Amino acid sequence: MNPAHLLVLSAVCVSLLGASSIPPQPLHLVQFNGMIRCTIPGSIPWWDYSDYGCYCGSGGSGTPVDELDRCCQVHDNCYTQAQQLTECSPYSKRYSYDCSEGTLTCKADNDECAAFVCDCDRVAAICFAGAPYNKENINIDTTTRC
């Protein structure tokens, strides 16, 4: 086999091994990602919001660093409220919604939990779209800034 082909094949195999270690995202996060992309076309939500400020990403504490971080805090609080509903798990609940020209609508066929979670995500996506994105708030030291 040609050494160049062998090198390319090896690189592909290593890439695939790395990709297989990435855990799948819960369906709801895929839906929330879609909502954000509806309100902010061209955004890459997993990249842009997974480690922003004190509240965007997993966990959250302290004082939000800016308006966008406050959107994430409100979203976290909304999920806490959703968990008060009977058998409602906002991190895994699937819901139905439409996106039309940047406008999000939660569908009427959602059950109570799905409607609540859908609205949490809809409000957050709209909030993200209206908030400035400050690159200096990416990957901050949460022990000193939050």
From Swiss-Prot:
The molecular function terms of the Gene Ontology recorded here are: calcium ion binding; calcium-dependent phospholipase A2 activity; phospholipid binding; signaling receptor binding; toxin activity
Which Gene Ontology terms describe the biological processes this protein takes part in? arachidonate secretion; fatty acid biosynthetic process; lipid catabolic process; phospholipid metabolic process; positive regulation of fibroblast proliferation
Q: What is its main location?
A: secreted
Record keyword Disulfide bond present: yes
| Localization per record | Secreted
Q: What family is reported?
A: Belongs to the phospholipase A2 family. Group I subfamily. D49 sub-subfamily.
* Cofactor-binding details, from the entry: Binds 1 Ca(2+) ion.
| Organism whose genome encodes this protein | Ophiophagus hannah (King cobra)
Q: Which reaction does it catalyse?
A: a 1,2-diacyl-sn-glycero-3-phosphocholine + H2O = a 1-acyl-sn-glycero-3-phosphocholine + a fatty acid + H(+)
**SMART domains referenced in this protein's UniProt entry, alphabetically:** PA2c
Give the protein's cofactors: Ca(2+)
In this entry the propeptide is located at 22-27
Q: Name one GO cellular component term.
A: extracellular region
Q: Which EC numbers does the record give?
A: 3.1.1.4
Q: Where is the active site?
A: 75, 121
Q: Please name the InterPro entries in this protein's record.
A: PLipase_A2, PLipase_A2_Asp_AS, PLipase_A2_dom, PLipase_A2_dom_sf, PLipase_A2_His_AS
Detail the disulphide connectivity of this chain as listed in its UniProt entry: 38-99, 54-146, 56-72, 71-127, 78-120, 88-113, 106-118
The enzyme's main class, written as a single word, is hydrolase
Which N-terminal residues, if any, form the signal peptide?
Answer: 1-21
Q: Which keywords, in A-to-Z order, does the entry hold? A: Blood coagulation cascade inhibiting toxin, Calcium, Disulfide bond, Hemostasis impairing toxin, Hydrolase, Lipid degradation, Lipid metabolism, Metal-binding, Secreted, Signal, Toxin
What job does the chain carry out? Snake venom phospholipase A2 (PLA2) that displays edema-inducing and moderate anticoagulant activities. PLA2 catalyzes the calcium-dependent hydrolysis of the 2-acyl groups in 3-sn-phosphoglycerides.
What is this protein called in UniProt? Acidic phospholipase A2 2
